[in-house]
Amino acid sequence: MTPVVFTPSDEPYLGRELLCAFDNLICSCLELNAKCAPLSHGDELTDLQRAACILVPQTITLALSIRELIRQGYLFGAKVLMRPFVERAVTLMYVFHNSEGLELWNQGWDYRKRPTLQKMADYLNEKLLHGQSPMKGFSQAFNSATHGDPFSAQWNVVFHEGVPVFPVSKNLCSPGLADEICAEAIPWLASAMGMMSAAFNQREVGPGSKTN
């Protein structure tokens, strides 16, 4: 009988390599956050630190939410959360590298003035990679899953006796999709860790590293 609620010892995608990597990164992220959080309690924070105080916890919370949805087999829900998760990580990197972006953030990040996720990705690609990484259509899949266009069906379909069906509950038979979600989440959580570390001048914590 399939458990109603899975635990870390019996979850459906337990043992997947990318899931293990995601778990390890989450542990490192929480350890780094434990070092940085006390530094955010001061009165004299920089504009970047104040932005990080909002964006970093939200990014981590969404990463944990995605992880729990994978554990419970709700892969489509995890996929839908990827856009808000990625957007926060990208926004944090954008305001770190763009003083005008940071000023927009300080002014309330007005929807009519702030750059789209795609435009932020394009800017960072030019700024950091000199345009070497093709970013065209970067936000398309995220938008598709979020807004529910026909293309989004690919993340909520399984084959039962050779026939495609669209599940309404747990998806326990799509390890490839679980891997895809983890592969998307890992670099952006790592990016948020880098920005957190830079904002509060802390060395990043990785598996096997020593802390004081």
Residue ranges and their predicted role:
Residues 1-43, 104-212:
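Long, charged low-complexity segments
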Residues 30-69, 110:
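Short, contiguous, well-structured surface segments enriched in hydrophobic/aromatic residues
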Residues 1-17, 51-73:
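Short, charged N-terminal helix-start/capping segments
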Residues 81-83, 99-108:
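"Short basic amphipathic alpha-helical interaction patches in structured regions
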Residues 52, 78, 82, 135-138:
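Short runs of predominantly hydrophobic/aromatic residues within well-ordered alpha helices
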Residues 93, 97-100, 150-153:
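Short amphipathic alpha-helical interaction/hinge segments
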Residues 56-97:
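Short, hydrophobic, well-ordered secondary-structure elements
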Residues 48, 71-78, 131, 178:
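Residue-level recognition of alpha-helical structural elements
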